[in-house]
Amino acid sequence: VGNTVNYLILGGAGFIGQHLTQALFDLKERHVGVTVIDNLTTSNRGATERFKEYKNLYRFIEADLTTMPDEEFLKIARKHDKIFHLAGSVGVENVDRNPAETLFNNLALANKLIPLFQQLRNRHVTFASTSEIYGEGPFNEEDNASIGPSSKLRWGYASAKLTTEFMIRASTFPYTIVRFFNVAGPGQLGDYGMVLPKFVNAAKNNQDLTVYGTGEQIRSFCHVKDAVEVLIKLSDTTGELFNIGNNSEPIMIKDLAEKVVALSGSESKIVTKTYEEAFSKHYGDIHRRIPDLKKVHDATGYTPKHSLDDIIRDML
């Protein structure tokens, strides 16, 4: 089709990448082609099988972006109109367990890819950053970044993502940066520390749901379908930073656990664990994290459609 828009999704076999792929194929107003490059470290091969129905419009390349030869990457990328860079090590528990590996990987990706994006000149890149950069807040795009204490390795992840943001801003290719706040939904793995899939998996199996600390930490969850819908809209803007999340239903983690048990009809019990029992000495938690969404709303009209109950039901 002459007017096909071709998208390259780096890390596209992951949780957000899969939903983004589906949302692109579901677009009514444009024909799309999607190519995914992913090393499948935090996703499974089945993630790519479901797009077989799109035949030659979907292509999956299993490769490690940090070691892929430059010319090979450029040759692939030049066939695409827009790039989503979602690749990277994720998850607070993953970062806590493998601090050096997650840091090196995220910085290696930046060092490798950003000069290549620069060579592509006019290809728009949307980079997935993180709400971790705000530390304890405030959570507005114009506020200062405020990562936590430098003695706690947890904040290395935020620092690597922030460094990547600066490297992108220092370049001359068109970009959009998004900071995701607690995006959740079907297909998300709990293995890396994402709280909702961990709770849902436990409830499904009538196992204990483990709440860390007092359970009074406050979070606000965004359905992945809302997140990828606005992510696509934002890929048509340039030079800006946006929060993506849902601020309508902040909830304490202990109440979230009770909600999951109630909605699932599970016989699970809720147990508590101290941070010391659960994590390394490098772990630090954020008490409250709720996004400021005024900027993304003003730019796109974004208002999340899915409630927290919707998210949990879709995951059950």
Where are these regions (language model features)?
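N-terminal Rossmann/SDR dinucleotide-binding element
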Residues: 2-79
